């Protein structure tokens, strides 16, 4: 799987100065999302119209996602102010053989979406996550009690890592947090949007049997992402041959 690699490389270059997070334990999760009013919050990262970027990218290339690690550009939660720009980017390295099998079984899109839905299923204690996948926005509200109890990006990263590793296809997890006010969030959002477009295109690839590019809803993405059109045509041929 190489179709995300160009955007992942851009993100890694843009975020290369991140400070490693040293993690001893995961932040506690709860069974149900907690109601958290703003009056009870110590922090709202990405709120009040500030930049708030959330993205998930996939690769099988170990040179892009070498190992599991988590980094931060900006201040840790204890030093953040109430309203702060925010980004959380997750990059997953997947097992190539397992991904090839998912492609053959036409289950790749559902697998990628299932991994994405981790953020909806994982409920962190003292946190309220608001997501707009259409706008690549992710706003994180954190309670005063959670801050008092020592919540950190390191603990949050460890909790997400454990959730992603529940998938046997996941070989490595990298999380990049950004709270630096002067960071170029627009560039990060552009990469986030393109990666979401790629994921959306997989749904069309595995459902559509047309080879007429002019009638294809994914044409604009295929025109720019190397490998997508070839994958689509390969699936069309399989469908036409009864495979």
Language model regions located:
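Long, solvent-exposed non-transmembrane regions
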Residues: 12, 34-40, 44, 70-96
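Charged, amphipathic alpha-helical stretches
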Residues: 1-67
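Intrinsic-disorder-associated interaction segments
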Residues: 1-4, 28, 80-87, 101, ...
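Short microdomains enriched in Cys/His and/or Lys/Arg
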Residues: 228-243
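N-terminal alpha-helical interaction blocks
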Residues: 83, 87-167
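Cysteine-cluster motifs in flexible loop/terminal segments that predominantly coordinate metals
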Residues: 191-232
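A broadly conserved sequence feature marking short terminus-proximal activation segments
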Residues: 140-201, 214
């Amino acid at each position: 799987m190489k179709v995300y690699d160009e955007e992942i490389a851009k993100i890694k270059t843009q975020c290369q100065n991140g400070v490693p997070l040293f993690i001893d334990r995961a932040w506690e999760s709860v069974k149900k999302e907690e109601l958290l009013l703003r009056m009870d919050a110590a922090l709202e990262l990405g709120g009040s119209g500030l930049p708030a970027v959330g993205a998930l990218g996939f690769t099988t290339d170990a040179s892009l996602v070498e190992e599991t690690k988590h980094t931060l550009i900006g201040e840790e939660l204890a030093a953040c102010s109430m309203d702060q720009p925010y980004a959380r980017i997750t990059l997953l390295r997947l097992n190539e053989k397992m991904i090839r099998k998912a492609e053959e079984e036409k289950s790749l899109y559902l697998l990628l979406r299932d991994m994405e839905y981790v953020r909806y299923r994982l409920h962190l204690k003292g946190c309220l996550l608001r997501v707009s996948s259409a706008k690549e926005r992710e706003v994180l509200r954190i309670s005063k009690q959670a801050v008092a109890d020592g919540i950190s990006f390191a603990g949050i990263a460890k909790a997400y890592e454990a959730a992603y590793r529940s998938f046997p296809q996941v070989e490595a997890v990298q999380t990049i947090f950004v709270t630096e006010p002067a960071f170029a969030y627009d560039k990060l959002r552009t990469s986030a949007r393109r990666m979401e477009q790629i994921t959306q295109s997989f749904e069309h690839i595995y459902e559509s049997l047309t080879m007429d590019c002019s009638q294809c809803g994914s044409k604009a993405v295929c025109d720019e992402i190397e490998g997508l059109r070839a994958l689509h045509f390969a699936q069309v041929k399989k469908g036409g041959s009864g495979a």
